[in-house]
Amino acid sequence: MDEFQRNSNKHRSWQQFFLYPLFFREDLYAIAHDHHLHRSGSSEPTEILVSNFVSFLTVKRSIRRIRKQNNSISLFGNSDSNKFIEYNKNFSFKSILEGFTIVLEVSFAMRSKHFIKGMDGWNSLRSIHCIFPFMEDKLPHSNYISDIRVPYSIHPEILVRIFRRWILDAPSLHLLRLILHECSFSRENLQKAMITQRENTRFSLFLWNSYVYECESFLIPLIKRFFNSQSLLYGSFPDRTHFEKKIKDIVLFPLQKISTKKIWLLKDSFIHYVRYGERSLIALKGTHLQVKKCRYHLFHFLQYYFHLWFQPYRICSLELSKTSFSFLGFFMHVKMRPLVVRAKMLDDLFITDLITNELNSTAPLKSILFSLAKEKFCDISGWPISKLSWTSLSDDDILDRFDRIWINLFHYYSGSINQDGLYHIKYILLISCAKTLACKHKSTIRVVREQLGSELFTKSFSKERESISSSFSKTRSQRERIWNSEISQITPLASFWQKMENKQIEN
């Protein structure tokens, strides 16, 4: 893959304008074949190769058959092998689609690099680890937030039009249109393919990333330009001559009556943009009228430019000081925090009261209990029950699974302000683990505790707690929080809570 990308860099113009010949190179499908085997984790690839319809030789024969035909539509038409059309059951079509995606991904990566270099004034962080510290640092300085939910349902022709802006190869666009229309990627099925399909994740993710990339490439500069044009307010610094001339034209009262205590400040509005999946947050520092106009322009821009009908709930504006919002499994709200500052100058002592804003993130305990009840760790009321499906495992595996669940939850919600409520979740998992072991050995919880003692789930937790707090206890205050983010823990939980929030909103 790296060698193919290096070779394509030498012939960038050829790759952008003539992608269609690359789709018939057999080495690309060999790369896709190896990628599919590594992704599926198959330890016996020979069983796949001997199948009649899941053979890599079938892919090579299909490529040669396409070369001899004048019309590529027969590839997806009503041929003798009807199973070839069923992409979710046909390994040949998956390999062809993987090779098709590889060619598009390389060209898309080159285009995205030029776009990032052209975004002057924007500092982008492309890691999920930066989301929560970034929001904790930037949101307290904002007063409004716009919550945008981009719909999954996309018309195939919109995707074709997006690719047509940076690929001028007509046969490639025809092939893409053919795949989108004939392979269950219609407007009704594209949402299902992107959300639930596990067979063809790479192509679906590429379509989704291309669509979101196109939205952001137009949306973010548009919002920035709008707020920069609305940010300068006349009436600031009335002691200056050039400002006084402008004030005379717009102010209806004499300048002599302007009190020095009511001098306006010249501030530039700023915005911050955060996105995870189809959920986007835009933090704004401006007036209510500016936010209302921004929502109006966002709605019409996405509706007319991408031909999408946005329901009213998909774009909502909230005032951070009055309401809270949920994002990636956290309930967040901005709260004012008074501070008393004492300044001593010679013999005088001055006491000043300052009010600052801070972002408080709360763990949704009820949602966590509902998820545990759904996975049969407890009942609806929160009473722990045994995990019967794990009784066939060994004792070490059972302890390790329960321990891993708690450690992941503890790390994910390490920055929440209600960590004391998480210990109730720990109690449920602890008793559920003991009941599972008791059910396996056909004994009681008391016998299990006597046999395992301190090794029952709490030993590993104490080590993790000490490793987290000991290194920061000397440098941090009691009000500061630690965001302990690990890629193996935060990504699955963030995706899980994102799906839960989407289901609640749609229902």
Curated annotation (Swiss-Prot):
Main location class: plastid
An annotated Gene Ontology molecular function: RNA binding
Keywords: Chloroplast, mRNA processing, Plastid, RNA-binding, tRNA processing
Compartment(s) of residence: Plastid, Chloroplast
Keyword Methyltransferase carried by entry: no
Superkingdom classification of source: Eukaryota
GO CC annotation: chloroplast
GO BP of this protein: mRNA processing; RNA splicing; tRNA processing
This protein's record includes keyword RNA-binding: yes
Role, per record: Usually encoded in the trnK tRNA gene intron. Probably assists in splicing its own and other chloroplast group II introns.
Database matches in HAMAP family: MatK
Family: Belongs to the intron maturase 2 family. MatK subfamily.
Stated name of the protein: Maturase K
Species of provenance: Calocedrus decurrens (California incense-cedar)
Lineage: Eukaryota, Viridiplantae, Streptophyta, Embryophyta, Tracheophyta
Gene giving rise to this polypeptide: matK
